[in-house]
Each structure stands twice: as C-alpha cells, then as structure tokens.
Amino acid sequence: MAGKRALVILAKGAEEMETVIPVDVMRRAGIAVTVAGLAGKEPVQCSREVMICPDSSLEDAHKQGPYDVVLLPGGLLGAQNLSESPAVKEVLKDQEGRKGLIAAICAGPTALLAHGIAYGSTVTTHPGAKDKMMAGDHYKYSEARVQKDGNVITSRGPGTSFEFALTIVEELMGAEVAAQVKAPLILKD
C-alpha cells in the first residue's frame, strides 16, 4: 500500500489544528503529504495567527498530481478563501472526476458546496457552518464527528481532527496501519 499521496490545500485563515494534525497523522502512516499554499509558497497566517510554510504552491502541486486524497482544512476565513478560488474548484473537480478521496473538516466542507462537489452526499460540518452547508438541499446532514459517504470524508472541528485524520489513514492504508499510528498518540477512546 506504499506510495499513497495527499494534497492539503492551505489558505489564509485556515484552522491550525485542522491543518497540522491531519498532515502529521498521515505522514506517520507513510502517506506522502504535500501542503500547498493557495496563494503560493509564502508562509500562510492561520486563524490563530500561527504561520505555516507550505511545501509548494497549489499551482505547482496540482501539476504533480494526481493525489489519493485532497484535504480542505476549516477556519471561517480559510474556508471562504477555498470557496472563492477557481484553482481549488479545478483541483476538486479533477479529484471528483477520477473518484479520488476528498476530505474536508469544520467549515472546509462549505468549499465543496461552493464548487458543486459531491452533491447528494451525507456530510458533517462545524455546527456554525451547518446552515450554510444545508442551503439549497444539496447534501444530507449528519451530526457524526466524522462522516464518510463514498469518496467524501467530512468532520466537525478542531477536536475531531485526530479522528478525521485516522479515518483518512484507514481509508488509504487500512485498519492495521491506522491502529499502529493511533496507539502511540495516546488518544482517549
């Protein structure tokens, strides 16, 4: 199962934990993760003023695809920036078209709505993004901490970041690898 690749799209205002925890957990599982800056390779200021340095620009990272999963962190401003980006739309449409995994957390799923991705799926979001996500009846809503429906994995917020990341690992690498990664993290069951 070696050779799995992930693309995490980092926009100004992204939620730090929802970015770093999935990146860390996926890398622990042996997934090659590229953190791509929406606005280029310059450091990105996140929602709590933490700066994260992308590995690549989104433009360059997209050329290096395809990826096994494309992940969208949350954060209100971050999700808004993802939602307004034609480049994000192109990446998501490509991923959906090839039936690749798409993962989004917190307010991140609102970018799926903005770009017309995975209509008809059951999703979850941060409670504060629920009304926006459900406008137009394009999705079914779940209160689950992590929701998987077909090739779409969504989650609720910073406190669900580990579960979200481990669900992605299990999907890409299998339950055994997910369990091996989880054990030393000392997570509460």
From Swiss-Prot:
One Pfam assignment: DJ-1_PfpI
Catalytic activity: N(omega)-(1-hydroxy-2-oxopropyl)-L-arginyl-[protein] + H2O = lactate + L-arginyl-[protein] + H(+); N(6)-(1-hydroxy-2-oxopropyl)-L-lysyl-[protein] + H2O = lactate + L-lysyl-[protein] + H(+); S-(1-hydroxy-2-oxopropyl)-L-cysteinyl-[protein] + H2O = lactate + L-cysteinyl-[protein] + H(+); N(omega)-(1-hydroxy-2-oxoethyl)-L-arginyl-[protein] + H2O = L-arginyl-[protein] + glycolate + H(+)
Cross-link (Glycyl lysine isopeptide (Lys-Gly) (interchain with G-Cter in SUMO)): 130
UniProt modified residues of type N6-succinyllysine: 182
Gene3D superfamilies (UniProt xref): 3.40.50.880
UniProt enzyme class: hydrolase
Lipid-bearing positions (S-palmitoyl cysteine): 46, 53, 106
PTM annotation (Cysteine sulfinic acid (-SO2H)): residues: 106
N6-acetyllysine, modified sites: 148
Active-site feature positions: 106, 126
One CC-aspect GO term: nucleus
UniProt-annotated location(s): Cell membrane; Cytoplasm; Nucleus; Membrane raft
PANTHER family per the UniProt record, alphabetical: PARKINSON DISEASE PROTEIN 7 HOMOLOG, PROTEIN/NUCLEIC ACID DEGLYCASE DJ-1-RELATED
Family of this protein: Belongs to the peptidase C56 family.
Function: Multifunctional protein with controversial molecular function which plays an important role in cell protection against oxidative stress and cell death acting as oxidative stress sensor and redox-sensitive chaperone and protease. It is involved in neuroprotective mechanisms like the stabilization of NFE2L2 and PINK1 proteins, male fertility as a positive regulator of androgen signaling pathway as well as cell growth and transformation through, for instance, the modulation of NF-kappa-B signaling pathway.
Protein's name according to its UniProt entry: Parkinson disease protein 7 homolog
Species of origin: Danio rerio (Zebrafish)
